[in-house]
Amino acid sequence: VNHYTVAKKRRHDDAYAPGGKGFMRPDRATIVYCNRIRQAYRDVPILIGGVEASLRRFSHYDYWDDKVRHSILVDSGATLLMYGMGETSIIECANWVADGMNPAELPKMRGICYMSKTPDPTCVQLPSHQEVSTDKRKYAEAFVIQYDEQDPIRGKRMCQQQDTDRYLSLIHISE
């Protein structure tokens, strides 16, 4: 987004880079930065959030690659994704980490996504990544479920199988 226009033309400036210079940040910055953190600090929990992470929390269509990509949690290798505005999630997470909580306990927070080896039985199951990446109707079905479950009053947890043994689970903000 920060490097190209919708017409895939290169932007010459970047309002969020030092001096407004373009191309100071990598494409898919969240994925690149998480991979660099993993190289330097193998076992450190990585928490991601913001617009890029929020919009790519489930399997999603990537305009630049013209294909459906996995959740950004899979691609980045991050431990936890905080979506939406994240004001309460980041404070709660910081308090948990400061208190020495195990990162495995963090998935109990609201407004987050995490990976697990088994699907949460209370989740609304979305079509799997394999299904949405090969079938347009399944992609549309997954989108409708995601849209419907974003309701702040009646929204439920959602799960989506990403690989044969990994499931993305989303804990709704209103829980």
Residue ranges, per PLM feature:
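Glycine-rich beta-alpha loop elements in corrinoid/cobalamin-binding modules
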Residues: 1-167
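Conserved small/polar residues in nucleotide/adenosyl-binding loops
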Residues: 171-175
